[in-house]
């Protein structure tokens, strides 16, 4: 599936669709380059480009990005399991080897608080400005907790500024991050929703994109638009699709989002 060399990860393109993985709404710290993408996470970065039938990930943090891209997971097995559902087949065929990332927990919490009622270009810009305050590195809970709310306002966080500050302080002053890693999915979601600015959708995104709980199905406006049956409420839709797709519901959500919101909408 992949092999590593000094400062390089070589992945078969059949095991990693870079565009689908980066542009499906789960990650905000990436930029297109002339020959591929640059991705940043925490204090780490990598450059990604195609080489024949392979994807090359150049980085000084090889082990970090093997884990970040979840390269030990057989994504094509997941796709085969979901292909028994006829309504998913077009999306599955269109998204290639989209992978659910394994992102740092605190960074994911803050990024998705910023994402609420926002669009991707603006989210990316705010997060880039936030990281720019710390040398282009995502801040630790302690660093972010020390930032005055007015400075968060100044970089465009708006009404989310107080939520970000308060959540950073909780993460800095308690052991909630360790508890989240150890908790079951339901308990993790309850803990997440105790943080200021974290509702059900943000909690679902964090448990899926950081904690790796693939059974979670975040419901956004695109899911309501394309997956809703009759007068279903968001909780009813979420419960139905999670029961239907089981342990792969989160993967189904990502391919449906990428297919409907990105591919068919452009």
Go through each PLM region and give its residues.
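HhH-family (HhH-GPD) DNA N-glycosylase catalytic core used in base-excision repair
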Residues: 1-266
């Amino acid at each position: 599936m992949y092999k590593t060399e000094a400062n390089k990860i070589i992945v078969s393109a059949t095991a990693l669709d870079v565009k689908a993985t980066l542009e499906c709404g789960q990650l905000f710290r990436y930029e297109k380059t002339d020959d591929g993408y640059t991705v940043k996470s925490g204090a780490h970065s990598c450059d990604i480009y195609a080489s024949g039938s392979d994807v090359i990930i150049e980085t000084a943090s090889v082990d970090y990005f093997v884990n970040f891209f979840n390269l030990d997971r057989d994504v094509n097995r997941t796709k085969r399991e979901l292909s028994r559902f006829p309504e998913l087949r077009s999306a599955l065929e269109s998204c290639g080897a989209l992978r659910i990332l394994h992102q740092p927990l605190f960074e994911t919490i803050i990024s998705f608080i910023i994402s609420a009622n926002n669009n991707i270009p603006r989210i990316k810009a705010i997060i880039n400005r936030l990281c720019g305050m710390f040398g282009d590195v995502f801040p630790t809970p302690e660093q972010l907790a020390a930032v005055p709310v007015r400075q968060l306002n100044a970089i465009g966080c708006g009404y989310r500024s107080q939520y970000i500050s308060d959540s950073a302080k909780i993460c800095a002053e308690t052991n909630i991050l360790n508890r989240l890693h150890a908790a079951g999915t339901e308990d993790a979601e309850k803990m997440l929703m105790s943080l200021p600015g974290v509702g059900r959708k943000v909690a679902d995104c964090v448990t899926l994109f950081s904690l790796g709980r693939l059974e979670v199905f975040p419901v956004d406006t695109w899911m309501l638009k394309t997956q809703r049956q009759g007068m279903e409420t968001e909780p009813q839709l979420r419960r139905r699709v999670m029961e239907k797709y089981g342990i792969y519901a989160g993967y189904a959500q990502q391919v449906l989002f990428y297919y409907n919101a990105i591919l068919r909408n452009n």
